[in-house]
Amino acid sequence: MSARSVFVDTPFASSPMKFIEDYKLDAHPNKVNLAGREYLAEHGQTTWLPLIRKIKQQIATDPTLIPEYTPVFGIPEFSRRATELALGTDSPAILQSRVFGVQTVGCTGAVRLGAELLRTWFCSGSSWSGSVFLSSPCDESLAEIFKSTGFEHVRYYRYWDAKSSGVFMDGLLHDLENAPDHSVVLLFASGHSPTGADLSQEEWKRVAEVMMKRNLFPFILIPAQGLCSGSLEQDAWAVRHCVSLGLEVLCAQSFSHNFGLYGERVGHLLCVLRQNLLAVQSQAERLVQTLWSCPSVDGARVVATVLSNPAHLAEWQEGLKAMAVRCMLIRERLHERLRLLASPGCWGNIIKPGGLYCCIGLNGD
């Protein structure tokens, strides 16, 4: 057939995953993958906590569970428990019925749904610049999500200071102070990717003060609640603080890391509003029907089962604490090894943050 394909002029897209493929093809015996995103056990593979494994087996053999589609917003019990996990059971937003949640296809799906909601309905009755501010650096996929959603201006606020190996607080505050009114600001409550450097509670108070003064809208990510500090409350403190101040908030949650459900794409989007909740909820439902119709059930059932049972919840929390402690011990061992080898450079930042990520400052050479 001589006819040309209608896709003949399609260029190759750049992909951050190409580095992983190159790594797999590299035959060097001493290669090291510094771009891993999963929590790995001692044998170098992802794993489940014993509790999660047990519950997955129970669900798989439960004769009362039948294959059926979930509601558009997912499993109601999962959404209720995920909301309480992020905001706390005594949250004023929950008590005042000012919040709704949507089970999503991973945290990526939560960010995409939130971006679609904001792009379509945020400040729809006023002149809006269409600006979203991301941290510099941040995961490249976040910028692509907002661009593909149609945001006119994807901008960045300064976050990482290579000289101090920590958060560049002065630059961050300056950039937010000068952001256009009603800009959306994407922030990490904990587990900042890719630096691992999180804001302290006092720093969060300053950021929240600027957002209130400048009419900025917080879109907050919680990628691994409980796995950064070992405390569910501490890792979600930023979201709870913003809600306590009366700010409207979108919050994207992931249950991949803290439950080990990497291949099951269990995410959740929280919407905390001051008013007009039912109308926004109806628009979210319409968007979900065009994005994935309804989410999968298995991983969400695991999460709902753990969070709704006090004994399971306590056991899961203990497992998270052990994982967080192990992450810190690995950091300390690496830091000590580099010190003993007299490796050039400053490695103190390895032991500063918690969680899975760390910015070690290596360049391409």
Pin down the residues of each PLM region.
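Conserved core of the PLP fold type I
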Residues: 53, 58, 63-217, 225-239, ...
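Walker B catalytic acidic pair
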Residues: 222
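Hydrophobic/aromatic beta-strand patches that form the interior of the parallel beta-sheet core
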Residues: 32, 102, 133, 155, ...
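Conserved PLP-binding catalytic core of the aspartate aminotransferase-like
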Residues: 316-365
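Short catalytic/ligand-binding loop motif for oxyanion handling, primarily in non-cytosolic enzymes
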Residues: 40-44, 194-195, 227, 260-261
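Structural signature of PLP-dependent enzymes
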Residues: 281-300, 306-335
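N-terminal "arm"/small-domain region of PLP-dependent enzymes with the aminotransferase-like
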Residues: 2-88, 290, 296
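Active-site PLP attachment segment
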Residues: 235-279
